[in-house]
């Protein structure tokens, strides 16, 4: 049986042994989280989109594709809009002065994002029947497929953006809150990045890649009008998926929906319609804008 003196001696020896073990233990090799850059952005008007709600962008060799958003069914009722006589939604190709070059009509509904690749536009619905509409340059629908990873018996939910990159389709998937890379032929998901939003900006919209391969995602707050709106951008490391930047916009900036990268600059469009806002509340409604550091 240990007396008090023996107990104290043993305790000191154990502590010394533990300290020595800690000094010789393998170092922590986990990759440290990168510092998150912060900053302010501003928008500058470039040109007006064709008449209608512009809610998606895609750069092409010929110019810029713009996705038309129409409000129909429950969406039209919610915004107090009449039911459109033609439910089809357009993909407009314009030059970099805003001149209309081509119009492709699609069966997308409440279109809230698009991509251009492999000679097709890929239109992302945010209303029943949901999914991605692949359409060729003659307006022929090649496919209509749901966003992957839905539960059995469910559709894939809505999307607020898409991007074509290196032969793959990236989708901003709303229901699972993921940025998904999908093989456009097999429709199998290959990569999933969590859409990280700050508590004050729970909404997410379109995504794009910059020249370094990093990912930018439009974010925003829940608000009742343009003055209350606080749009933002989240930047992800394109190799790790980790957040490396969070940016706010100067007051008076456009309300960004679509997002693209062209000639070293982020490009966006202000749809002129926003959940919870009066229609056309943004003074930049209908404008394509560039985004730059303030």
Language model segments and positions:
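Blade-level signature of beta-propeller repeat domains, shared across WD40, Kelch, NHL, RCC1
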Residues: 260-294
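Beta-rich, blade/repeat-based domains predominating
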Residues: 51-60, 108-117, 149-165, 199-212, ...
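A short helix->beta-strand "capping" segment at the edge of beta-propeller domains
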Residues: 30-50
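Short loop/turn segments that connect beta-strands within beta-propeller blades
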Residues: 95-97, 136-140, 183-187, 237-241, ...
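A short beta-strand motif characteristic of beta-propeller blades
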Residues: 42-47, 99-104, 141-152, 188-197, ...
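N-terminal secretory signal peptides and thylakoid transit peptides that target proteins
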Residues: 1-14
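A short loop-to-beta-strand structural motif that recurs across blades of beta-propeller domains
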Residues: 89-92, 131-133, 178-180, 231-234, ...
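Conserved beta-strand positions in repeat-built beta-propeller and related beta-rich domains
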Residues: 50, 66-75, 83-85, 123-128, ...
């Amino acid at each position: 049986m240990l007396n008090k003196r023996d107990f104290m001696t043993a305790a000191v020896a154990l502590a010394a042994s533990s300290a020595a073990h800690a000094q010789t233990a393998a170092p922590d090799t986990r990759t440290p989280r990168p510092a998150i850059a912060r900053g302010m952005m501003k928008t500058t008007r470039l040109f007006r989109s064709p008449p209608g709600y512009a809610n998606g962008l895609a750069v092409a060799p010929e110019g810029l594709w713009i996705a038309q958003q129409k409000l129909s069914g429950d969406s039209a009722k919610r915004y107090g809009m009449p039911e459109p006589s033609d439910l089809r939604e357009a993909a407009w190709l314009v030059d970099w002065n805003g001149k209309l070059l081509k119009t492709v009509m699609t069966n997308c509904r409440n279109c809230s994002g698009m991509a251009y690749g492999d000679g097709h536009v890929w239109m992302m619905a945010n209303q029943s029947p949901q999914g991605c509409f692949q359409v060729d340059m003659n307006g022929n629908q090649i496919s209509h497929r749901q966003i992957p990873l839905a539960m059995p018996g469910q559709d894939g939910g809505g999307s607020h953006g898409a991007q074509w990159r290196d032969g793959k389709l990236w989708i901003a998937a709303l229901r699972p809150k993921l940025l998904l890379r999908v093989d456009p032929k097999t429709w199998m998901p290959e990569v999933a990045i969590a859409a990280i939003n700050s508590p004050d900006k729970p909404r997410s919209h379109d995504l794009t890649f910059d020249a370094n391969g990093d990912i930018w995602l439009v974010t925003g707050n829940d608000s009742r009008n343009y003055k209350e709106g606080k749009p933002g951008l989240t930047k992800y490391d394109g190799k790790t998926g980790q957040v490396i930047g969070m940016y706010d916009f100067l007051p008076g900036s456009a309300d960004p929906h679509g997002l693209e990268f062209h000639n070293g600059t982020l490009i966006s469009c202000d749809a002129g319609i926003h959940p919870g806002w009066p229609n056309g509340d943004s003074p930049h409604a209908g404008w394509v804008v560039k985004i730059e550091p303030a």
